[in-house]
Amino acid sequence: TREKPFTCTECGKGFSDKSNLRSHQRTHTREKPFTCTECGKSFSQKIGLHNHLKCHTGEKPFMCTECGKSFSNKSNLHTHRKIHTGERPYICTECGKTFPRKKNLQSHQTVHTQEKPFTCSECGKCFSQKKNLHTHQKIHTGEKPFKCNECGQAFLRKRNLLSHERIH
């Protein structure tokens, strides 16, 4: 193992070189010096910005050998592969439900805490999960993304489309 003479004064973690220590320290300061010129989103690491830029170029060099779906970064491909393996290592201690990603578990846990951190800017209604806020906001925009191939009727929610399709 390499010598780690550079130590973080905040948490005690050691690093082999000063640039890695500086990069790590931004996790404590929340400093994000790398900014996307396209959309303004900022990152604490240069690699974060580099990976993000691919969403603007559409570049997706990491392909799943199982199904052919492509991803802009290796981390997203790795997470995606859990769909095929069935791996769901993150477990909710409250109800036992399992998740393939840590952030899915964290999002789910707001259901148990009654925390509703996502607020609609249009009407003030609050939601425990971001995806539910996004679905709700379509009420205000009138967007109905799920369309019946049979008759053309459109729906706000996929479950409503599936229910509707049973009548054809």
Swiss-Prot record:
Highest taxon, organism lineage: Eukaryota
Example GO BP: regulation of gene expression
Subcellular localization(s) per the UniProt record: Nucleus
ZnF (C2H2-type) intervals: 6-28, 34-56, 62-84, 90-112, 118-140, 146-168
Keywords: DNA-binding, Metal-binding, Nucleus, Repeat, Transcription, Transcription regulation, Zinc, Zinc-finger
PROSITE patterns: ZINC_FINGER_C2H2_1, ZINC_FINGER_C2H2_2
InterPro entries documented for this protein: Zinc_finger, Znf_C2H2_sf, Znf_C2H2_type
Gene Ontology molecular-function annotations: DNA binding; zinc ion binding
Gene Ontology CC: one annotated term: nucleus
Main subcellular location: nucleus
Stored Gene3D superfamilies: Classic Zinc Finger
SMART domains, sorted: ZnF_C2H2
Cited function: May be involved in transcriptional regulation.
Family of the protein in this entry: Belongs to the krueppel C2H2-type zinc-finger protein family.
Name this polypeptide is given: Gastrula zinc finger protein XlCGF7.1
